[in-house]
Amino acid sequence: ELVDKGMAAYAAKGIKAHGYVCDVTDEPAVQAMVATIAKEVGTIDILVNNAGIIRRVPMHEMDAADFRRVIDIDLNAPFIVAKAVLPAMMEKRAGKIINICSMMSELGRETVSAYAAAKGGLKMLTRNICSEYGEYNIQCNGIGPGYIATPQTAPLREKQADGSRHPFDSFICAKTPAGRWLDPEELTGPAVFLASEASNAVNGHILYVDGGILAYIGKQPK
């Protein structure tokens, strides 16, 4: 259903698109999907690894199976999909791989141990793909989004019953030099840049689009 909606949105703009459904943690399924795409459309020139999940549970209460599931989708899947597209990129001596990392690639926070472990690993996978395949003119970079104003985060930004701000909303705005949540469209420019020839000399880099959170220690108390 989500794929159909996406295809319809592209069609409404006059853009021809192809949609495929695949379990990105299933290596044979991914290999088959990549082969199908190559046959129907052509080999993949730009890969964006953006599938991901999060489990918010204190580490001492987290099931090992849940930890593995987060690692499987957030770290193993980007490895599996990148592995599948790399041979064609190597043959063409050109390719772009963009991994969606996170501020948790750099920071820790309560209840997200599995997510932070996966995103930290994805940062290093990004750098290693750069190191291993840069000689083939393949660029692998990452985008580390900050806190984005999406329908999923809307409950965290809504006013409380007494008219006060949600505590997490206040927390994020205080931690962000910009003093606000980021708009999804603000990720567009970085993604286009990393997918274009303008970034041919940029490799192994994580571009943090976070409103300055990682650079900011917070305001000094008065």
Which residues are covered by each model-predicted region?
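Short, small/polar-rich loop/turn modules that mediate ligand/substrate recognition or access, typified
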Residues: 48, 134, 139, 202-204
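Substrate-binding pocket helix/loop in short-chain dehydrogenase/reductase
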Residues: 58-59, 66-71, 168, 172
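Active-site loop immediately N-terminal to the catalytic Tyr-X3-Lys motif
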Residues: 59-61, 107-113, 135-136, 179, ...
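C-terminal substrate-recognition "lid" of short-chain dehydrogenase/reductases
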Residues: 79, 94, 180-209, 214
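Active-site helix of classical SDR
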Residues: 82, 118, 126
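Alpha-helical segment proximal to the catalytic Tyr-Lys
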Residues: 87, 131-135, 200
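Residue(s) in the substrate-gating loop at a strand-loop-helix junction
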Residues: 102
